[in-house]
């Protein structure tokens, strides 16, 4: 599930697991009264993140029949606006499972021998990738990881075991590579950089096989960002290498948003290596390209994965680069403006986490803690992004020895514990 509410918890308990309220409460280690409150509130109430994770675990452990019952119940449900979004995804996922694997099978078992795959299958995979990207902007990757991985498993099974024409096969490779990128991104946001690195490599290999330059550039750009991750094991040199390769491949692709992204990623790699002149040159290019895109490229003509490349994204890269170069006050000012302007909850939370971390590095501990508390509130309620939590590590370190920092470090440590101690 992307986000569990009382309505989904009730379906999990009653339809999928076939438990009584008391049995379900015992499994979760809570009182039956709490379960009843969730279910009575329905879709208007979201249990806290650690319960969301417990629901995911219960569903993961359930047998195939229980998964099938749960998926069908979601698809048949006829409720409010957020339910519509969930039904779209679950119908898509059921479509994938019907076309490829037994419903909700969590294995790499093969598709039926001799099964034919056509354009409908490819369109279904594309729809799943688009849905994951749209939901990620609102809730973060933590709660989408299971679904993205499940879709990717099914797509790979289709690719490896089904029968299709050469034309459909090429399209299927591209669609599977796109799902690998989606899965890699939500893994990155969930602080599973090992999975992200694996799935980005899968995407790049599929792009090469399919001759899909757009997919190759996308995979290289995501891998570059992973190499530059503040929590990663990569390096600015590796990020620059990947970015330069993507720039070469993208020379004949007409998209100012794409060229803005490549320039912005190049800028932060230069900044991380202390190269101010090349940072200024690259970030200037990014601004020119994104401003051209804003005036000349219609949203309808922009690939969905590039729609996030707007001035706010370039602003984020500029702030990050200036922080690398030691211009902490300038970076903090840019992050603050970006956080206020971001409409998507996940992105706004990530901006504010970067702001808090920068303020802590600059020695403004009180303001860093205040911003950090706001971020923790989002992570506790409606955004699941362990990557964002880890961005707050400098604030946690500063709060440990600061008067008034106790609330922050207690809440931070509680969230960290929910993620198995990783943050």
Describe the predicted segments one by one:
Residues 113-423:
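Conserved binding/catalytic microenvironments
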Residues 6-7, 18, 200, 316:
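Generic non-transmembrane alpha-helix signal with a bias for helix starts/N-cap capping motifs
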Residues 1-16, 26-28, 36-111, 411-419:
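Short amphipathic recognition helices of helix-turn-helix/homeodomain-type DNA-binding modules
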Residues 10-11, 22, 204, 247:
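Short glycine-/small-residue-rich flexible loop motifs, especially phosphate/cofactor-binding loops
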Residues 30-31, 178:
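Intrinsically disordered, low-complexity regions enriched in Ser/Pro/Gly/Gln/His and often acidic
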């Amino acid at each position: 599930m992307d986000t569990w509410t009382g309505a989904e918890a009730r379906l999990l308990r009653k339809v999928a697991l076939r438990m009584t309220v008391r049995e379900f409460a015992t499994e979760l280690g809570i009182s039956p009264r709490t379960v009843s409150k969730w279910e009575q509130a329905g879709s208007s109430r979201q249990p806290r993140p650690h319960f969301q994770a417990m629901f995911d675990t219960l569903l993961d452990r359930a047998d195939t029949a229980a998964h099938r019952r749960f998926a069908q119940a979601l698809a048949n449900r006829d409720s409010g606006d957020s339910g519509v979004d969930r039904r779209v995804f679950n119908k898509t996922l059921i479509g994938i499972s019907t076309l490829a694997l037994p419903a909700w099978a969590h294995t790499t078992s093969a598709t039926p021998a001799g099964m034919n795959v056509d354009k409908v299958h490819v369109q279904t995979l594309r729809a799943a990738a688009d849905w994951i990207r749209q939901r990620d902007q609102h809730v973060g990757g933590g709660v989408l990881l299971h679904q993205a991985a499940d879709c990717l498993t099914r797509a790979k099974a289709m690719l490896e075991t089904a029968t299709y024409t050469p034309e459909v096969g090429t399209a299927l490779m591209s669609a599977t590579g796109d799902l690998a990128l989606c899965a890699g991104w939500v893994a990155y946001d969930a602080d599973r950089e090992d999975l992200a690195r694996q799935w980005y490599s899968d995407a790049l290999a599929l792009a090469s096989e399919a001759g899909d330059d757009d997919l190759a550039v996308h995979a290289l750009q995501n891998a570059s960002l992973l190499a530059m991750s503040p929590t990663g094991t990569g390096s600015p040199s590796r990020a620059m290498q990947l970015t330069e390769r993507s720039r070469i491949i993208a020379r004949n692709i007409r998209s100012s948003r794409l060229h803005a992204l490549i320039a912005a990623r190049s800028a932060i790699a230069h900044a991380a290596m202390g190269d101010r002149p090349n940072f200024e040159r690259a970030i200037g290019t990014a601004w020119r390209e994104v401003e051209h895109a804003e005036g000349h490229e219609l949203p309808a003509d922009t690939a969905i994965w590039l729609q996030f490349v707007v001035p706010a994204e370039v602003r984020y890269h500029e702030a990050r680069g200036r922080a690398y170069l030691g211009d902490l006050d300038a970076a903090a000012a840019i992050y603050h403006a970006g956080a206020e302007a971001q409409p998507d909850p996940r992105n706004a939370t990530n901006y504010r986490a970067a702001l808090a971390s920068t303020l802590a590095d600059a020695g403004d501990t009180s303001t860093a803690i205040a911003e950090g508390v706001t971020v923790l509130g989002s992570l506790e309620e409606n955004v699941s992004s362990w990557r964002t939590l880890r961005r707050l590590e400098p604030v946690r370190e500063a709060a440990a020895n600061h008067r008034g920092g106790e609330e922050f470090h207690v809440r931070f440590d509680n969230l960290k514990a929910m993620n198995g101690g990783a943050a």
